[in-house]
């Protein structure tokens, strides 16, 4: 019986500026999910990036790979993704599945998953890590595994970084990964041959409060509490923003917000318990950059304070 090795630690992409000339590179979508390696032999086993065995968590992926490979042996590398009703990846949905080591029919139906496969590092007794990216992709395509819940993640060539960023932003995806066409698979290495680039969204937000800073800068501005108006005209809390502010910006905002303080929150219920929060009249508008909105802003940062902006016209961003 052929012995299939356990999956190695996956190759990782570097966070670096994309090259000005992308000749010789291939673009892939950056999925907002969890890295998954599939060891496909007599039975299929699934492993996380940290080598945790997740086989029982995702039985639909196991069944689909068993049927699709028809007895062939392989180690596949990809991303496990949960898509919301807008067809956009939603990381919170995957978290629900991870909390259930043996999901029941109801959870399987309510949170379906997709395994987006983007690499193959072993096939029918052959180690493919020394093959080039394009060679491995052709072998992966030849397996014809593209049947839900398995998707062969597409790749693109001959496109610029700005155009690719715009496409990813339009699709509501996290960003893209650039992979050199001649790169070999380097297990466990964060390689410069793969470059990840996160595409971020921008949106005006209304400041409804702030949290003073603690520690060395006690009494200064720690974080802004921001929100936007729903269709009923109520100000909804969207999150706190502490990144992206220079000392000068913090000082000028603190001076401005201090004059706008009021005893009651301007945000409609429910809002989380925000220790030390100070509330203000919702007249200041700021430009916020963020990765994703899921009812809360993910990885927000302040870009600028908008002068003379009408705070009443700031609506909630779409989720996803």
Residues of each region from the PLM?
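Catalytic cores of nucleic-acid ligases and guanylyltransferases
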Residues: 1-320
